[in-house]
Amino acid sequence: MQNRKTYDDWVKKWITQSISVLIMIDIMTRTSIANAYPIFAQQAYENPREATGRIVCANCHLAKKPVEIEVPQSVLPDTVFEAVVKIPYDKQIKQVLANGKKGTLNVGAVLILPEGFELAPPDRIYPEIKEKIGDLYFQNYRPNQKNILIIGPVPGQKYSEIVFPILSPNPATNKAAHFLKYPIYVGGNRGRGQIYPDGSKSNNTVYNASATGKVSKIVRKEKGGYQITIDNPSDGRQVVDFVPPGPELLVSEGEFIKADQSLTNNPNVGGFGQENAEIVLQDPLRVQGLLLFLASVVLAQIFLVLKKKQFEKVQLVEMNF
């Protein structure tokens, strides 16, 4: 009997622990999906850069903010170099999270490299570059698009400057690569977006009235947010607008409002920006030729100076005679 009781207790404990683990996994999965905004672009767009040159992240992150990129002016074939993306913002500001509370901003970036350029393999990255990268994890936009890299969301407090380790192609082994000047495109955002890919609004944007009329009732919902009832005097209908937790309400009961008038403030403090740079894939033979030319010019100058000094000495001797 005692053994039976012990067995039942063990089964109950095991079931309780299993349920707890499943709940935690579900929460973590939902959180990661909610925060992983590069996934939205990957799922909705085959290419992150439209034919117009606009990067698709701007479709969800409506506010325009600056972004910077630094790359070498030129690189040699089969060489690892740094592409530094800077996403500046005020570290003191807080954003509205999905649950309506305030929190720190995350950042993310997409780097569109020329064909043939790709993320450097771990064994090719120099220790000093690894130190700058930290714990960042980069991934390809598509498995077959190694030249398009994405990162994020990552904590903006720590990673407002992101170092991408890039490996340049070698035209000797990659026939698609050539010794030319190439463009590089980058997009960087800080904070959450205002619109989801399906067109629905997030709680990180302004909410407007859907009808003209008098605000007859405002109900604060138990989990946050508001239910706003608008009486339309023209046809006597009632319209109900819902505001999720996060934005601050600007209207009050009894107030007359017009259609499309702002019901809330705009809580967004982030934004998206894009920039481009150029890089030259330099031919080593051309570099060697340039060095030889410069060396010959220097030697010629030295010989001219020596010849001039010799000529001056001869003139001086002739004058003494």
UniProtKB/Swiss-Prot annotation:
Keywords: Chloroplast, Electron transport, Heme, Iron, Membrane, Metal-binding, Photosynthesis, Plastid, Signal, Thylakoid, Transmembrane, Transmembrane helix, Transport. It is a single-pass membrane protein. GO terms for molecular function: electron transfer activity; heme binding; iron ion binding. It comes from the Eukaryota. GO terms for biological process: photosynthesis. Binds 1 heme group covalently. Pfam families: Apocytochr_F_C, Apocytochr_F_N. SUPFAM superfamilies: Cytochrome f subunit of the cytochrome b6f complex, transmembrane anchor, Cytochrome f, large domain, Rudiment single hybrid motif. It is found in: Plastid, Chloroplast thylakoid membrane. This is Cytochrome f. The lineage of its organism: Eukaryota, Viridiplantae, Streptophyta, Embryophyta, Tracheophyta. The gene is petA.
